Structures are given as structure tokens and as C-alpha cells.
Design a protein with these regions (language model features):
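Short helix-start
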Residues: 36-58
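Short beta-strand micro-motifs in enzyme catalytic cores
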Residues: 8, 43, 89-91
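Short boundary/loop segments of OB/S1/cold-shock single-stranded nucleic-acid-binding domains
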Residues: 52-71
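Polyanion-binding surface elements
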Residues: 3-21
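Major-groove DNA-recognition helix of helix-turn-helix-type DNA-binding domains
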Residues: 19-42
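Mid-protein regulatory/catalytic core that forms ligand/cofactor-binding pockets
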Residues: 65-136
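Histidine- and aromatic-rich ligand-binding microenvironments
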Residues: 30, 35, 49, 123-128
Length: 136
């Protein structure tokens, strides 16, 4: 037996939340032909088109560092929190809709002069990345 999976589509509000923009922005993109919609009512955005647009948006973020690196997972964002406790520090970076948390030495946090509002690049190099999907 062949298994045919229905194409994933998203409501405008879901697409907006996933892209970190307002519903109105998604509607404008639809009106401008940037995002297609399926023939359903209310309008739904095909998942593959939404994914392609998410990649375009992500590549628009300027990486302020002038470094070459083997790490490919780079999150440009703003430091939102620095909590120093003894010899360790927790630094939170908000990169679009993504919150990246780093644990580092308090000395490193001070040397980097990290504080809320600082521009930073969270660089992730991992040997394991777990992918999850919602159950249907």
C-alpha cells in the first residue's frame, strides 16, 4: 500500500508566529505575491513555501563578526539577559523567534562585556541535533 501524506499548510496566524512577524505582515506578503496560498478558505500557506521564505528571512540577518568558522549554526541577535553567579554566567540571546541560552564562565561574560541590548552571535556546533514533529 502506498502512503500519501497531505501537504502541510498553515493558517496566517500560525505562519506569522513561526516567522516572528505580525499577521498583517503575512497578509501583505500574500497580497504582494511573496507567499502563495492554497485554494482553501480561510487561506492557508503551503509549508514548503513558508519554509523557503523562512530561509530567505534568516539569510537577511547580518553577521557582525569578521571570522571564518566551521560552525554553521549561527544566531545573530540581542543579549536579553546576563545572570552571573560565582564563576559561571548564563547569557540569553534572542535571535528572531529563537531564544538561545549559553552557559559560560563569568570571566568570559565580563571580557565580552555582555549586557542586555548587546549585539551578539550565538554559535552552535553540536554532534547531535534532535528533530521532533507534532503527532497528527
Amino acid at each position: 500500500r502506498g502512503y500519501v501524506r497531505r501537504m502541510t499548510t498553515y493558517r496566517i496566524s500560525e505562519a506569522a508566529r513561526l516567522l516572528g512577524v505580525s499577521d498583517d505582515t503575512v497578509r501583505r506578503w500574500i497580497d504582494q505575491g511573496i507567499l502563495p496560498v492554497s485554494g482553501e478558505s480561510p487561506a492557508r500557506i503551503p509549508g514548503d513555501a513558508l519554509a523557503a521564505h523562512a530561509v530567505e528571512l534568516a539569510s537577511a540577518a547580518e553577521d557582525p563578526s569578521d571570522r571564518l568558522s566551521s560552525a554553521r549554526n549561527r544566531f545573530v541577535g540581542l543579549v536579553t539577559r546576563v545572570q552571573i553567579d560565582g564563576v559561571m554566567a548564563q547569557v540569553d540571546v534572542q535571535s528572531g523567534p529563537h531564544r538561545v541560552v549559553s552557559l559560560m564562565s563569568a570571566e568570559a561574560a565580563r571580557e565580552l562585556e555582555l549586557e542586555p541590548g548587546s549585539l551578539a552571535v550565538a554559535v552552535v556546533k553540536a554532534t547531535t541535533v534532535v528533530i521532533e514533529t507534532p503527532r497528527d
